[in-house]
Amino acid sequence: MASTEQGGTDQTDRGLRKDYFNSSGVTKFIPPVFKLLEMAVAIICIGLIDDPANNSRFRVFMTARTTALAYSTFVPFLILSVIYLFGKVLRENVPWKLQSLLNLTAFIMYLATAACILSDWSETKNRNYWPPNTQRMDFQCGAGALAIIGALLYLIDLVVTVRLGIKGDIE
């Protein structure tokens, strides 16, 4: 009788350990790695759009709407990534459903921002100013391309978060 109770206790103890430690193996490191990559993309995009958005006096490289959309996309998701990573350091968990919603929102916003930045780049390229300021146009094109990469990172992070959340590996 005592041995069957211990067997049940062992199974219960394993379940408690899984709940306590939340996830095991590599799966607990996947979301923070995505957040680090997303944070790096946001920092680089902010650096790339700063010059074409703010330092062009005579020629407009980016419209005010595109600049506002870019800053209001990159900065908040940069802050959210920092908060997420800071929470991981303090061992606080973000619910996977909330994280999935934020990833979906970030994917949509990054895609819209990339479309606007590349649209402004295309319009500036087709104006045929001579001599063209290719450095600012390269910064703008690079920011648009990195915004697409950021959107793909958020999409992959969304898929991974949903899969791990449904499996129960993350809360």
Predicted segments with their positions:
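Intrinsically disordered terminal tails
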Residues: 1-35, 44, 51-62, 92, ...
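Signature of small four-pass
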Residues: 31-45, 49, 63-124, 143-164
